[in-house]
Amino acid sequence: AVVITSIDPTHHDYVMKTLAEEKWCFCEKPLSQNAADCEDIIKREQEIGKRLVQVGFMRHYDRGYAEMKRIIDSGEIGKPLLIKCCHRNVAQGPGFKTENGVTNVAIHELDICRWLLGDEYEDVQCVKVRQSSNSNKGYDNPQVMLMRTKNGCFIDVEVQVADGYGYDIQCEVVCENGTVKLPDPYAVVRRSRP
């Protein structure tokens, strides 16, 4: 197996080389920097006829998110209506660009919300809000992403990569008859009728 954790622009070529050898591959996100290269990887993997590539989305394996998914899938608190997410980091590295807020940070929320809901996105927009003085010059920070799924669930994601205090991940799913929330420290809180 091959583990790819190199800089983003190298991911596509390295993954394609591992596929040429038909080796298992774990690739840190993003898989590539554009949709065409991602489709190229998927096409090659399909030609081989088995899944060989896994992208570094670790939240599916997190105990808290797994419990949130169990509650949502059970239907115990009704169908999901909206999700509120927050992803904050203490600082950004030199050269960090606005698009990295999506491809390296918010991508985790995009992935986990899709997984929690078992639904696809229909509409996505990114909104520029009042900017933090803690950001690299020319970088939009924070960013807010607003999304709607095909089944009508609304999702808002706040991404801030220079909050000055630490790593902070939050997720709350508001359903018809209650909520399920991943607060600090990562333990699930459920609120609903008894």
Range-by-range predicted roles:
Residues 1, 13, 40, 67-70, ...:
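Alpha-helical elements of Rossmann-like donor-binding domains used by nucleotide-donor carbohydrate transfer enzymes
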Residues 1-5, 26:
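N-terminal Rossmann-like NAD(P) cofactor-binding module of classical short-chain dehydrogenase/reductase
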Residues 6-7, 159:
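Short glycine-/small-residue-rich Rossmann-like dinucleotide-binding loops
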Residues 104, 108-189:
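Contiguous beta-strand/loop segments that form the cofactor/metal-binding neighborhood of enzyme cores
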